[in-house]
Amino acid sequence: MMERFPRLAQRVLSVPFTPKYLKSCKKTNPLTSHLMQLRGSQRPIFIQWNLQGRPSVCTDLISKKNYSSATARAGWFLGLGEKKKQAMPDIVKAGDPVLHEPSQDIPLEEIGSERIQKIIEEMVKVMRNAPGVGLAAPQIGIPLKIIVLEDTNEYISYAPKDETKAQDRRPFGLLVIINPKLKKKGNKTALFFEGCLSVDGFRAVVERHLEVEVTGLDRNGKAIKVDASGWQARILQHEYDHLDGTLYVDKMAPRTFRTVENLDLPLAAGCPKLGVC
């Protein structure tokens, strides 16, 4: 099954495979012959903001800035005890062309196939292992229209209550959306710091709509619709952008891009104020 992936791509996706892309897929694609070991020292990435412009909470990854090995050993995110290395795809980093390629729709008849289900399983594993609240297929080197996301009470409990209230951040269970279509609702937007698993170590302010409607198919090929607001709406927009080949840095507010270490510093004069517009 692993060796058949190039033929799957030719038959289903009609995606041109450049040598560079094939090299990337060899390292990241769950349907190639070898799965790479995720580096145990990989540092979590997270999205943070508050109304005073000080960092604290994330969207693409849920983690604390000072992520200690002690908390990791305690299994504080997943309750699974000590984290162990697992064979799974690496997260593709900014600079790889796959992150700027429009993703391909998946034919309905292919959704239930072992190949597509394997991709979904790997995406969920990678997202939770990060740990994170969202992931798009291009982030593991696969230009297909699949996104996965979830936010839990446990994740949210690590953020101050006043901030999660300001974010309108509420838990939701695992969502797998195939061939999603996103519609922005209303005119209200908000400006928050945002980060990405594929842009390690950096953050920037991004304006997002407060309410969206997403339609698509679940992992069984059944039609679904998600009406989201607040933090969940932001996560959906972030992941949906990945399917169009867009990173948050392509939408960031000017002069707000910075390293994680500099998140405590105030924004430059003239930068937009954080919060609901």
From Swiss-Prot:
Gene3D superfamilies: Peptide deformylase
Compartments (UniProt record): Plastid, Chloroplast stroma
Organism: Solanum lycopersicum
Protein name, per record: Peptide deformylase 1A, chloroplastic
Catalysed reaction, written as an equation: N-terminal N-formyl-L-methionyl-[peptide] + H2O = N-terminal L-methionyl-[peptide] + formate
Residues binding Zn(2+): 196, 238, 242
Family membership noted in the UniProt record: Belongs to the polypeptide deformylase family.
Plastid is among the record's keywords: yes
